[in-house]
Amino acid sequence: MYNDKGNTKYLKLLKQNYSSSQDVIREIVNLSAIINLPKGTEFFLSDIHGEYEAFLHIMNNCSGVIKEKVDLIFKETISDYDRQELCTLIYYPREKMALLDEQGKIDSDWYAMTLNQLILVAKLLSSKYTRSKVRKALPKEYAYIIDELLHAQEDEDANQVRYHKQILKTIIDLEDADEFIIALSALIKRLAVDHLHIVGDVFDRGGSADKILDLLYDYHSLDIEWGNHDILWMGAACGNDACICNVIRNNLKYNNVEILENAYGISLRQLMLFGMKTYGIEDGIEAARAAITVMLFKLEGQLILAHPEYEMGNRLMLDRLDDLQDVGVDRKRFPTVDDERPYALNDEEAVIMRKLHRQFVTGQRLQKHVRFLYDKGSMYNVYNGNLLYHGCVPVDSNGAFDKLYIDGEFYHGRALLDKCDEKARAAYVDNPYKDDVDFMWFLWGGEKSPLCGRMLKTFEMEYVTDKSMWEEPSNPYYSRYYDKSFCCQILHEFGLYDDDAHIINGHTPVHAIEGENPVRANGKLFVIDGGFCRAMNKKTGIAGYTLIYNSHGLRLKAHTPFTSVEDALINNTDIETSSEVEENDKRRMLVKDTDIGKRLIGEIDDLHKLLENYRRL
């Protein structure tokens, strides 16, 4: 059975890593133990929308997981207030200690008590991982010390207890306790979440997406499912001028000039001066917005005309401005539109566009962040039996997968998302095809785009006074994803047939205030729009949802709005979470039930074959 050429060659390669039967046995024992540990905790977030402070807090409290562990350990021994103090210390160790020091609350007894409490929390969180994995997570400067403290055991003569106390006493005496507390707090947060899923839209109206990406850049394990706002910035960084105009317009609309000018070095001065001169608007931001909006519709029109396969001809507006006066469009707001060539930039606009283009494609920090989005991101992800995507899988009015004509072929369902992923990556190479770069704009705003899924009415909202024309029809997906059979159809399309498979979806806010439920299709689909956008909190009634998937099952968490870091430090204010157990596994889920576990089982099988081979020698 194992003597064919393929297996013989494979076994020879395995032997290079395991030089004896004892090496093989040791690895089989190791992997067999690993696959029987509890599954690590997955944390799902979506629609961060550039809101850094709220995002930082939800990352620090791990969607309430830290508080749950602190309560589990200390509920019977320390007060509610002291538990909240400990949680805030874990969330913001440096800032909280500075405040406590000002209040005169820190002394050697406080250090000793706090260090012991933090070690207990770290011990609990590390218990589901191998010692090797925990060691890899330890901060290098304290790795040996923390490893000793986490694994100190009581013995008959209390030797280990004395050893433990002496380590902590020495740290305090050497005045290194602050840094040690910071290191322990970081370890606790790292152990609380094994893997992070960002289900789209790091960017949008919030002004600090750059800070969020800086934080994510160093995160230990994550994936990103691109959102429509992410792909817009990615398209801008690829050099798509329509995407560049959209990015600038969106940030001017929400007065987020800092992310453009300070974070990414995009100068708006020339655009502002042109807008003030051409549109007669004194306010620089409003003038720049007026100018970039007209440039946007010109450039979008060029793309629509060049790509009839986008099926977006109904979005061509500048060649019928006179007709649109009947619905309130003021022709005077388009001073640079030439009736003979309505979609052509004039000379001044073209000069401005070239300079903006150059800044977007050469800006080092923006390119670093976009490269990260490409490296960690994709159109969708199948992970541990769940299907993750931001927007939708486009369907027609009958619920059948809708077709889109790309590069000479029709694509639908999973093949469509795969093709979109391929095109997006092709746009971010040296000397890309113009068609691939053009497609980035379609992904942002195309009615049949899996990332958009609706007809954007940007023109109407900007210029039309009749608000009845502002409604943006959505893809039938959004009316059908309440149906279990429809969601199962999508899951099957992506190769998921297990009863425990789910769709994890972002993109659309859940209006809890109106009784809307984030759980759809009898539990087959979860909408986890994170609700970080402050402007939406009053409309939805909450600050969105996150999802936790640990060894005990799935838990959906609803959040209250975040106030501020200052409030959290002074008053121990947390983002309150209400947790609903959506699915409680009948048995605890182990590593062997995960994607990684299945690969390890395959490795164990191969090692058994190698062991048989050794024993036949």
Where are these regions (language model features)?
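Feature recognizes metal-dependent phosphohydrolase scaffolds
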Residues: 1-617
